[in-house]
């Protein structure tokens, strides 16, 4: 499946619906819609769509937001925002 129709849908949202919102609501940079368009362009409909969905799910008050660009390469595991701290788990070769 080509990503072009999905990118057009995102651009339509940006032109028509987004300006009608009373205030900017995205906590990330680039915005979730721009991230979606970039992810679809870079990674195609399936992988780019997955990245876009994962980003929208993270755009909520429980996540601090910030700068989160589209990864250059599709991650093997779920994407984590760049610059986010690593988990608190100690290395496996050391006792906890």
From Swiss-Prot:
<feature type="compositionally biased region" description="Pro residues">
    <location>
        <begin position="82"/>
        <end position="96"/>
    </location>
</feature>
<keyword id="KW-1003">Cell membrane</keyword>
<dbReference type="GO" id="GO:0005886">
    <property type="term" value="C:plasma membrane"/>
</dbReference>
<comment type="similarity">
    <text>Belongs to the UPF0161 family.</text>
</comment>
<comment type="function">
    <text>Could be involved in insertion of integral membrane proteins into the membrane.</text>
</comment>
<protein>
    <recommendedName>
        <fullName>Putative membrane protein insertion efficiency factor</fullName>
    </recommendedName>
</protein>
<dbReference type="Pfam" id="PF01809">
    <property type="entry name" value="YidD"/>
</dbReference>
<keyword id="KW-0472">Membrane</keyword>
<feature type="region of interest" description="Disordered">
    <location>
        <begin position="68"/>
        <end position="96"/>
    </location>
</feature>
<dbReference type="InterPro" id="IPR002696">
    <property type="entry name" value="Membr_insert_effic_factor_YidD"/>
</dbReference>
